[in-house]
């Protein structure tokens, strides 16, 4: 078994923020077989492994990673009826575009997310009121402890706001995911994609070196009634959001006057306070 594993590979060029040290070992797994065998290789040598997608939600330590970093580069996307099955390394914008061409709606909101299918499922990525978990029908993942490939239903994935079972169990490596979409006309789907894109350009730091929203919004139900009232009294700008599920972190940071605040080359966007950019 020959695996194209490299040594001492810089990770900074492989992340949006362009920071971080080197990986002791690195492999770009172009096939599912290489992906599985590379994890087996890491376990054989008692090395930790880390799955790196598009690098859009990763901060790499300057100390690097003293194990094996595996980048899934297998990215096949198939359609059967209203179902779309995408491998872990497929980019979300490409999946959204192909779904549009197939006349399948549901992924329009994801057309501007700079991540992979695997990463999107792991973090239950979402925006504009939609989430990856809302569409997922099932997925396949490799259990590196048992050495088996397991199938997960939507319920098995334990989706919640920006969470899934896969964030809590790093031994599970996502291989592919199947999504249930709705039939629609490509022109109508494209209009919605254009509308979402326009909203992004208007409100977000598009084009900057950034990875989207940094912090999760704060759920109201995570605090007591009294604490909630104190916050509303202290920050009157939050009153329009008191009946919503979350407190927008961008509004909190903006209220604190942190838009444009910087340390070194890292800066809080002047356009959207939950976007951190590199100047």
Give the positions of each predicted feature.
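Anion-binding (especially nucleotide phosphate/pyrophosphate-binding) glycine-rich loop
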Residues: 1-128
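Phosphate/pyrophosphate- and phosphate-bearing ligand-binding catalytic cores of soluble enzymes
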Residues: 6-7, 15, 58, 149-279
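Beta-strand secondary-structure signal
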Residues: 26, 85, 138-140, 174-178
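Short acidic-glycine loop/turn motifs at beta-strand connectors
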Residues: 62, 80-81, 143-148, 183, ...
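A structural signal for short hydrophobic beta-strand segments in well-ordered beta-sheet cores
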Residues: 77-79, 141, 215
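Hydrophobic, well-ordered secondary-structure segments
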Residues: 92, 96, 110, 114, ...
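Active-site glycine-rich loop that binds ribose-phosphate moieties when present
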Residues: 122-126, 134-144, 148-165
């Amino acid at each position: 078994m020959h695996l194209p594993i490299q040594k001492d590979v810089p990770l900074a060029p492989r992340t949006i923020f362009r920071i971080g040290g080197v990986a002791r070992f690195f492999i770009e797994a172009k096939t599912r077989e290489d992906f599985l065998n590379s994890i087996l290789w890491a376990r054989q040598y008692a090395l930790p492994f880390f799955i790196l997608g598009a690098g859009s939600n990763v901060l790499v330590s300057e100390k690097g990673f003293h194990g094996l970093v595996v980048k899934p580069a297998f990215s096949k996307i198939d359609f059967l009826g209203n179902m779309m099955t995408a491998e872990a390394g497929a980019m979300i914008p490409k999946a959204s575009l192909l779904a549009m061409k197939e006349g399948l709606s549901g992924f329009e909101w994801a057309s501007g997310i700079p991540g992979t299918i695997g990463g999107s499922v792991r973090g239950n990525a979402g925006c504009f009121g939609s989430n990856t978990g809302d569409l997922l029908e099932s997925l396949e993942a490799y259990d590196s402890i048992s050495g088996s490939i397991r199938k997960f239903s939507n319920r098995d994935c334990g989706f919640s706001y920006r969470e899934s079972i896969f964030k809590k169990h790093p031994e599970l490596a996502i291989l592919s995911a199947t999504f249930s979409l709705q039939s629609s006309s490509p022109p109508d789907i494209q209009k919605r994609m254009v509308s979402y894109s326009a909203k992004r350009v208007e409100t977000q730091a598009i084009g900057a070196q950034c990875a989207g929203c940094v912090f999760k919004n704060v759920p109201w139900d995570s605090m007591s009634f009294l604490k909630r009232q104190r916050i509303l009294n202290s920050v009157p700008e939050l009153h329009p959001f008191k009946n919503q599920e979350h407190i927008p972190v961008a509004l909190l940071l903006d209220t604190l006057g942190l838009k444009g605040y910087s340390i070194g080359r890292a800066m809080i966007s002047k356009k959207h306070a939950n976007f951190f950019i590199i100047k």
